[in-house]
Design a protein with these regions (language model features):
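Active-site and adjacent substrate-binding regions of carbohydrate-active enzymes
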Residues: 1-299, 305-325
Length: 325
């Protein structure tokens, strides 16, 4: 809704239009889900849930991609956990639409208010040095601010000199976090295909977002996915395995309970539990170092490695994820 003398962003009449659409859809097409794609700071984003029953059913979780990226880049989960611990939904009829990458870049505005501007700029600089492209906006005072990083999520998480084994481990770690969060996860086609930065596409098409929009011939991509020596094969098959595991365990259902905390600055714990009292614990080591963590009364089997967890001390290898049940 546009109105002279205002920013034309998030005006009350915008919300009234959504309420009207929701009322119509609920009557003529019950069961239809409304999702809002608002790439803005978190507090403005969640406003589109309305009262929990009168606007969007799902909201894109735009803060998740840059926060997971920040956690892996800094090898520190504290900012991610601090934000996630405050996630609340207005009703049981709403949930999050979680993602890490899309056909657009990684938005930085959803980080504002969650991280100091100095840390955002530090992240941007580090990614630029590794080959990411950045879109900027001009401020009224003549300065510029970055608003979007253009890069595949694979290359955002790793460095140029990283081995494919490390690239895959970091990438699977990030997507295991995505799959563990409350809500509905979505995985971009370029991500599950293990795509790298497409600089030729940027040069050909003339815009930064082309870096993560490569088009493939079916035979070409099928050949690479079937070649066990390729990064694509490793990413596709390991990520597909995690998705299959997730679908097999009810604890991950969007309506089920969620808690998150830090074991230390590099290890995050996510617990999901259902109405029957069953609990699944995810442990995520975002560092390049082995982490030894002591957790009492955590026994079960790691669904990913298929190893039984018997003692209180658990060893997590660099970038390792465990789903313990």
């Amino acid at each position: 809704w546009k109105e002279p003398g205002t920013s034309c962003i998030h005006l009350e009449k915008t919300h009234l239009i959504i309420k009207l659409l929701r009322s119509i859809i609920d009557n003529v097409a019950p069961g239809t889900v409304i999702i809002t794609e608002t790439n803005v700071p978190h507090k403005d984003n969640i406003a589109y849930f309305g009262a929990g029953d009168d606007e969007a059913h799902m909201v894109y979780q735009f803060s998740l991609p840059p926060l997971v990226l920040h956690a892996v880049q800094k090898q520190n989960v504290e900012a991610l956990c601090a934000w996630a611990q405050n996630l609340t939904l207005p009703s049981s009829n709403t949930t999050w639409f979680n993602f890490l990458a899309s056909h657009d870049g990684i938005g930085l505005n959803p980080l504002r208010g969650l991280l100091p501007e100095s840390e955002i700029l530090e992240l941007v600089e580090a990614l630029q040095q590794e080959g990411a492209l950045v879109n900027w906006k001009n401020n009224p005072d003549g300065t510029r601010s970055p608003y979007e990083i253009n890069v595949t999520y694979m290359d955002a998480l790793s460095r140029r000199e990283s081995s494919d084994e490390e690239r895959c481990a970091r990438f699977i770690l990030a997507h295991a976090i995505l799959l563990s969060f409350p809500g509905v996860p979505a995985i971009y086609i370029q991500s599950i295909l293990g795509s790298r930065n497409d600089y030729a596409g940027v040069e050909k098409l003339g815009y930064n977002r082309a870096i993560n929009r490569k088009k493939y011939h079916s035979k070409e991509i099928t050949r690479e996915l079937n070649d066990e020596a390729t990064l694509r094969h490793a990413v596709y098959h390991e990520l597909s395995r995690l998705i299959t595991l997730r679908r097999s365990h009810n604890e991950f259902h969007p309506d089920n309970n969620f808690t998150i905390d830090t074991i230390n600055s590099s290890v995050m714990r996510i617990q999901r539990s259902n109405a029957d009292g069953n609990c699944l614990t995810g442990l995520f080591n975002v560092s390049k170092n082995i982490q030894h963590v002591n957790i009492t009364n955590l026994h079960g089997r790691d669904l990913i490695s298929e190893v039984d967890i018997l003692g209180n001390e658990i060893t997590l290898h660099p970038w390792q994820v465990m789903w313990i049940k």
